[in-house]
Amino acid sequence: VKTLAQIKEEFKDFIILITFGTHIPEVMANIKALEKEYEVLIPSVPVAGECVFNRSYLVRNGEEIMNAYNLMADEESKEVFKNMCYFEYTGELKYLYAMESSKDEAFKILNLNSEEDYLDLGAYRGDTIDEFLKYTCNHYHSITALEPEPKTFKKLVEAKGDLENTTLLNKAVWSFDTELEFRADMGRGSLIKNNGGLLAETVSIDSLAEDTKFTYIKMDVEGVEFVVLSGGMTLMAEHKPKLNIACYHRCCDIYRLPAVIHRANPNYKIYMRHHPYIPCWDTNLYCI
């Protein structure tokens, strides 16, 4: 390991590659300061899947990407969409900075109210429940939250088990009810795998909705968003819940997720926003 000063002494010309993710303001500010003096690039490696957002990928999927772009509900969403593509292709931070906006703005789109039946898919330790409570001023009809990783679920119960009208489920979400092997040693990035070590009970959105017609769904399920959405087609078609869907885990999320939401219910208005994060994580679809 060498310091920046040592690198400057050893090399007259160099490029800095950032190979970690952060949303810590001080760290992001340091990266921005480095960019003023040096060429700084962020290699785009998807959280899930093996695709790379390169020229051949754009050629293969160009038509579907343009179709998704045309589904965006406002000009800001289209700008975010374009800048996300530019960033994924080039790794240049200027595109990332150009697409940033606050969570407050995104939740103005959702316009949550005191009668929401909230479904939190990927609840972790309860931070997104806190976010929901913030934007509903602690007034809601019900909360249903799923977290499959046993140790994390225990912390979720400790943090949120006393909330009124709240159901916490130690389950994963999938396109149908079954049992799947689950990689449970990755913390927040836990994934469903074919060669995992832990059996997890899975349920679909439509199965959960037999008891509660959810009005708002937040989904951050580490790369299986497309599969999970396909298990909620009936609820989306018949009741059109508000959606807050992570769309950055796989390269194909940028076009497949808007397409499946539109197919479920063409009346959805689909917005895209990116919140401060390096690399292009915390990029979500907000659908109403």
Segments the model singles out, each with a brief description of its role:
Residues 1-288:
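Phosphate/nucleotide-binding beta-alpha loop and adjacent structural elements of enzyme active sites
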